[in-house]
């Protein structure tokens, strides 16, 4: 009969378990503290048979389990790397790798044996924690199987990905201590490069705005993406009924973000693909490269060029900001070239394991690296992508958020969008004419010079993306920027934002106002508002925004500052539903004459014990 060959070797499996069981013990010990012991602690506080206690017990057990899932990210990140370092450690020594590869075991068998031993150990630890947690919960007559199953599944998916990533790092190097370095770099390199490029563009581009991190950058940062996918899912309020005199109490049920399963499944699929790549590399890996920085010769130029370029860009930028803070583009370029060459030399010395690396070919390659590094910096400086002058077409914009000092609004009507785009173009034209950038100057630096304002725009585009810009511009009287900015700050919704009454619309308008108060800061006098008075004040604020006594001039500080003598704490209390209310703070700018007249007619009284957070509301009627 033909002899059948197994895909793994039982002896290797047993050997790995015997050698690396302390790692599994540590993994389980940490998890025991994180989950089962926390379940016991939370459940003991609910030990009883009173009405409502069982519901609280269920909520607390559920919350402990769901809140432990972010810990799975950290545990999988650490122990995925440790497990990979353990099972592939023999590849880092010429003696052990020669002994292992001399055994009558194929590399495919060895690969699957090591992978199964590592993933099997992590899975065994997870299942043990699952059972211990269930046992601890059962002692209090309730087990949240759904939450426990969710924890087990997500933890397994994370462990698969991080172990695969650690195995890839172990397969490309012959140094054991280089594995965690590569592992950490692969988890954050995309984010670090984005931060470097973002900082450079902020230096060079007029109007650059620190917007949200692009989606593809977050996906290339596994630990951050997975953390965001399983943490901060919010909480659902739950009302629990107890016997009198306790009555109804409010609790929170922690929820898992909707993206948790999809994100972890995607990364687990990537982990399987990485393991397939590791299998291929393992079969091709030369045994004699044990102890070398890179296990494959074709990876060495990639490594030194990556270290040279990334180190030059990042460390050069850091050097410029720390040692030459006032330096310009030339200073930045020199810093990046110097640091790039140093990193390039250091990488080659590590790869060659010697200091004598200089020859004609090496100098030519160094010169090529310097040219590429300089080209990258120059291309960013020249804005070859057209970022600085990119202006969206009006038909491509679904809505726009505009902000100038304290005046802001969000609109989707074509007229508002077109006005903001016109201002956008005018600001760029003024910059092209003057070349003036004021972002890094304080107001004291420009004292006696042109009047400046911060202007921010945020376009939401039809393709689902956004375009954000932020400028500090000088406003010359009669210029296009002055004219267009005047039109925008004099919109009704812009005036409403200056007063603060714009937020009232989301709560139902004036009819939602139930009370309020006005307090003078200088005398600590207070005027409490009845429901009718508070609604009258809200109506007058809306009237001031819609029909101002005169146009606002963005060149004047009066357009956003308090009216003289009306620097007050004004709060309107609005009802959201039958059980919830909130407050809307108001300002009294100079143009709000109706509000000023109304406040002058109020009766103020001194009350040293007055606390705005405990104002009694006598006229709350939930009709």
Language-model segments: residues:
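Secretory targeting signals
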Residues: 39, 62, 69, 116-179, ...
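Terminal transmembrane helical anchor/hairpin motif
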Residues: 3-5, 41-66, 191-281, 286-295, ...
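Aromatic- and glycine-rich beta-strand/loop motifs that create alpha-glucan
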Residues: 1-27
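Internal/C-terminal transmembrane anchor helices
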Residues: 303-311, 345-387
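Membrane-interface segments at or immediately adjacent to transmembrane helices
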Residues: 378-463
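Short, structured surface segments that line ligand/substrate-binding pockets
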Residues: 434-474, 550-586
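Long, hydrophobic alpha-helical segments
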Residues: 67-96
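Helix-loop-helix units of permease transmembrane domains in multi-pass membrane transporters
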Residues: 87-120, 286, 290-291, 530-550
């Amino acid at each position: 009969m033909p002899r059948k060959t197994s895909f793994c070797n039982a002896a290797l499996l047993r050997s790995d378990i015997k050698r690396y069981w302390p790692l599994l013990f540590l993994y389980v010990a940490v998890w025991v503290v994180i989950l089962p012991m926390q379940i016991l602690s939370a459940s003991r506080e609910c030990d009883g048979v009173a009405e409502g206690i069982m519901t609280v017990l269920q909520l607390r057990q559920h919350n402990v389990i769901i809140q432990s899932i972010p810990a799975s990210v950290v545990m999988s990140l650490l122990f995925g790397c440790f497990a990979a370092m353990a099972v592939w450690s023999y590849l880092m020594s010429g003696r052990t790798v020669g002994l292992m590869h001399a055994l009558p075991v194929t590399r495919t068998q060895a690969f699957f044996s090591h992978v199964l031993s590592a993933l099997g150990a992590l899975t065994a630890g997870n299942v043990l924690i699952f059972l211990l947690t269930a046992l601890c919960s059962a002692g209090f007559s309730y087990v949240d199987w759904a939450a426990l199953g969710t924890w087990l599944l997500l933890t397994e998916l994370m462990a698969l990905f991080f172990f695969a990533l650690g195995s890839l790092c172990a397969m490309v190097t012959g140094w054991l201590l280089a594995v965690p370095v590569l592992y950490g770099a692969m988890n954050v390199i995309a984010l670090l490069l984005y931060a470097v490029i973002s900082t450079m563009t902020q230096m060079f581009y007029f109007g650059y705005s620190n917007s949200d991190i692009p989606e593809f950058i977050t996906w290339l940062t596994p630990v951050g993406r997975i953390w965001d996918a399983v943490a901060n899912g919010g909480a659902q309020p739950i009302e629990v009924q107890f016997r009198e005199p306790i009555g109804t109490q409010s609790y929170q049920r922690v929820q898992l973000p909707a993206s948790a399963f999809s994100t972890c499944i995607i990364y687990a699929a990537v982990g399987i693909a990485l393991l397939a790549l590791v299998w291929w590399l393992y079969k091709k890996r030369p045994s004699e490269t044990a102890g070398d920085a890179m296990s494959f010769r074709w990876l060495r130029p990639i490594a030194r060029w990556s270290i040279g370029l990334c180190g030059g860009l990042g460390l050069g930028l850091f050097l410029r900001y720390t040692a030459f803070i006032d330096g310009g583009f030339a200073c930045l370029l020199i810093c990046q070239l110097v640091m790039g060459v140093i990193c390039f030399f250091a990488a080659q010395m590590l790869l060659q394991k010697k200091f004598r690396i200089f020859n004609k070919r090496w100098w030519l390659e160094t010169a090529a690296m310097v040219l590429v590094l300089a080209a990258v910096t120059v291309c960013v400086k020249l804005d070859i992508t057209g970022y600085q002058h990119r202006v969206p077409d009006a038909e491509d914009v679904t809505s726009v958020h505009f902000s100038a000092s304290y005046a802001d609004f969000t609109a989707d009507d074509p007229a508002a969008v077109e006005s903001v785009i016109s201002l956008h173009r005018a600001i760029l034209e003024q910059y092209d004419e003057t070349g003036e950038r004021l972002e890094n100057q304080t107001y004291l630096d420009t004292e006696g010079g042109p009047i400046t304002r911060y202007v921010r725009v945020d376009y939401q585009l039809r393709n689902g993306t956004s375009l954000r810009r932020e400028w500090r511009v000088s406003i010359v009287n009669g210029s296009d920027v002055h004219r267009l900015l005047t039109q925008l700050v004099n919109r009704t919704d812009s005036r409403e934002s200056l007063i603060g009454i714009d937020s009232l619309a989301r709560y139902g308008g004036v009819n939602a106002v139930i009370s309020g108060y006005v307090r003078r800061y200088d005398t600590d006098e207070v005027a409490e508002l009845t429901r009718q008075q508070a609604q009258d004040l809200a109506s007058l604020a809306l009237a001031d925004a819609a029909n101002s006594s005169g146009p606002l001039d963005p060149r004047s500080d009066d357009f956003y500052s308090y009216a003289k003598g009306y620097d007050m704490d004004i709060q309107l209390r609005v009802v959201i539903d039958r059980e919830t209310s909130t407050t809307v703070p108001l300002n009294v700018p100079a143009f709000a004459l109706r509000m000023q007249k109304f406040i002058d007619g109020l009766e103020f009284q001194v009350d040293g014990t007055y606390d705005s957070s405990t104002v009694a509301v006598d006229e709350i009627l939930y009709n």
